[in-house]
Amino acid sequence: DVEEGEFFGLLGPNGAGKTTLISCLGGLTTPTGGRILVRGIDTRTDRRAASLVLGIVPQEITFDPFLTVRETLRFQSGYWGILRNDDWIDEILANLGLTDKADASMRALSGGMKRRVLVAQALVHKPPVIVLDEPTAGVDVELREHLWDFIGRLHREGRTVILTTHYLE
């Protein structure tokens, strides 16, 4: 069990099932047994409601190369039915060091910048549970510290954070 407001780490080697568990949480993979409840919501029987309380940062970097960073976040917001949240988007961009990249094309960003956008996408709907699958893979030390500071702040504000990693640092 992961308690509400907890910072929980899934530590294990490659192939241990960390990403598979996250895929089950997000409804991308159907568990072969048991149940997964997120804030009391069954991820199997009520995927939409469960997804509304989850912000998942995937391990793989995926993006629409034809959108800017801001357009990407607005599009993601629309997916959640949120049409006007530019103030929150601006706050996310500032906290992730992306303000100066807001109008840049996604295809023009470095890998580390794209990873920051993945984090921003997971946060646009202000989910109470944040799941990060190897969020600092391939990013520099400065970004890593900046990201942890921001995630730490969100945790102190009451969000539950679940993190997967290979290493203790």
Where are these regions (language model features)?
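Helical segment within the ABC ATPase nucleotide-binding domain
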Residues: 144-157
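Conserved catalytic motifs of ABC-family nucleotide-binding domains
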Residues: 126
